[in-house]
Amino acid sequence: MSVIKMTDLDLSGKRVFIRADLNVPVKDGKVTSDARIRATIPTLKLALEKGAKVMVTSHLGRPTEGEFDEANSLKPVVDYLNANLDVPVRLVRDYLDGVDVNQGEIVVLENVRINKGEKKNDPELGKKYAALCDVFVMDAFGTAHRAQASTYGVAEYAPVACAGPLLAAELDALGKALKEPARPMVAIVGGSKVSTKLEVLNSLSKIADQIIVGGGIANTFIAAAGHNVGKSLYEEDLIPVAKNLAASTDIPVPVDVRVGLEFSETAAATEKAVNEVKDDESIFDIGDKSAEQLAEIIKNAKTILWNGPVGVFEFPNFRKGTEIISHAIANSEGFSIAGGGDTLAAIDLFGIKDKISYISTGGGAFLEFVEGKVLPAVEILEKRANG
């Protein structure tokens, strides 16, 4: 992907405006999950090492544009950075008409979503952001699918617009998995509905050698194969779509499943053959035989793309399928990339974070990239790089 990279630029004495993803959960003024901040710190340190005058900003929550709201302030992020960095970090609320930045400090510009015109990519706001800097650095993959003033507009008007290390790594990893994957390539697509992942499935059917489906998506494929799914979550109207996909792509249907009588943490799990599901039962996980068969497919894969669990792994009784699949991915020698909220929760639960080749930081952006869509914030960086 031809974008200018921050790592290749001389930033000495330059005013650098970094758009990061610091949209972290906050409770009682304290950051409760610091993953996104920790991911951004190396970018900030690199900019400082290169002698830049560093500004960084992000969105946080959903404030009303034009109104400052303490609940959506980046102050907890500033407090976190001050506690974890050896350089002074200060928060500036009013910065659109200019801000003084010194070398050796980090200036955090208050939540971009407080600025009128941010979401609709108002060109005047984009120009104001651009006037603050010599170099704009887009480093928030999680918002790259949105054309907003701080992700797109500023990149149009800044003297130089480039990709930060996080964004560049994300694009490289996704490119490696989707553009020229080492084969065989296996995709794991879980989730409750075929309809929400239809474009993902269609796109992957043209790339992957095999697609493993899980969750409610798998139930629709089980029904398409002619089996009773009882009270399971599935989409009857999408059975023809599932049949077409199964006819053109290798999509293994589970041979056994775990069922329950109610959707609850305490529901008892019964393992049975896929053709023995009763009318009052719901499928909540794949069975051991299916999990082992799929683990074998994963073991032989050279590229693995993972988006979504294969069962209701939040409930201990219906966790085993996702656990077996997760460990198979972790133990595979192939290149693995994982993305999506539920997938990240499974990675944390099973303690396999260090064994996945690349974990994507973007939910919606990850899916849109997999669907083959152009991400606006990346598109504008490419345009700027190519004059």
UniProtKB/Swiss-Prot annotation:
<keyword id="KW-0324">Glycolysis</keyword>
<dbReference type="InterPro" id="IPR015824">
    <property type="entry name" value="Phosphoglycerate_kinase_N"/>
</dbReference>
<keyword id="KW-0418">Kinase</keyword>
<feature type="binding site">
    <location>
        <begin position="340"/>
        <end position="343"/>
    </location>
    <ligand>
        <name>ATP</name>
    </ligand>
</feature>
<feature type="binding site">
    <location>
        <position position="36"/>
    </location>
    <ligand>
        <name>substrate</name>
    </ligand>
</feature>
<keyword id="KW-0067">ATP-binding</keyword>
<feature type="binding site">
    <location>
        <position position="146"/>
    </location>
    <ligand>
        <name>substrate</name>
    </ligand>
</feature>
<feature type="binding site">
    <location>
        <begin position="59"/>
        <end position="62"/>
    </location>
    <ligand>
        <name>substrate</name>
    </ligand>
</feature>
<dbReference type="Pfam" id="PF00162">
    <property type="entry name" value="PGK"/>
</dbReference>
<feature type="binding site">
    <location>
        <position position="113"/>
    </location>
    <ligand>
        <name>substrate</name>
    </ligand>
</feature>
<dbReference type="GO" id="GO:0043531">
    <property type="term" value="F:ADP binding"/>
</dbReference>
<keyword id="KW-0808">Transferase</keyword>
<comment type="subunit">
    <text>Monomer.</text>
</comment>
<comment type="similarity">
    <text>Belongs to the phosphoglycerate kinase family.</text>
</comment>
<feature type="binding site">
    <location>
        <begin position="21"/>
        <end position="23"/>
    </location>
    <ligand>
        <name>substrate</name>
    </ligand>
</feature>
<dbReference type="InterPro" id="IPR001576">
    <property type="entry name" value="Phosphoglycerate_kinase"/>
</dbReference>
<protein>
    <recommendedName>
        <fullName>Phosphoglycerate kinase</fullName>
        <ecNumber>2.7.2.3</ecNumber>
    </recommendedName>
</protein>
<dbReference type="InterPro" id="IPR036043">
    <property type="entry name" value="Phosphoglycerate_kinase_sf"/>
</dbReference>
<dbReference type="GO" id="GO:0006094">
    <property type="term" value="P:gluconeogenesis"/>
</dbReference>
<feature type="binding site">
    <location>
        <position position="314"/>
    </location>
    <ligand>
        <name>ATP</name>
    </ligand>
</feature>
<keyword id="KW-0963">Cytoplasm</keyword>
<dbReference type="GO" id="GO:0005524">
    <property type="term" value="F:ATP binding"/>
</dbReference>
<dbReference type="GO" id="GO:0005829">
    <property type="term" value="C:cytosol"/>
</dbReference>
<dbReference type="GO" id="GO:0004618">
    <property type="term" value="F:phosphoglycerate kinase activity"/>
</dbReference>
<dbReference type="InterPro" id="IPR015911">
    <property type="entry name" value="Phosphoglycerate_kinase_CS"/>
</dbReference>
<comment type="pathway">
    <text>Carbohydrate degradation; glycolysis; pyruvate from D-glyceraldehyde 3-phosphate: step 2/5.</text>
</comment>
<dbReference type="GO" id="GO:0006096">
    <property type="term" value="P:glycolytic process"/>
</dbReference>
<feature type="binding site">
    <location>
        <position position="197"/>
    </location>
    <ligand>
        <name>ATP</name>
    </ligand>
</feature>
<keyword id="KW-0547">Nucleotide-binding</keyword>
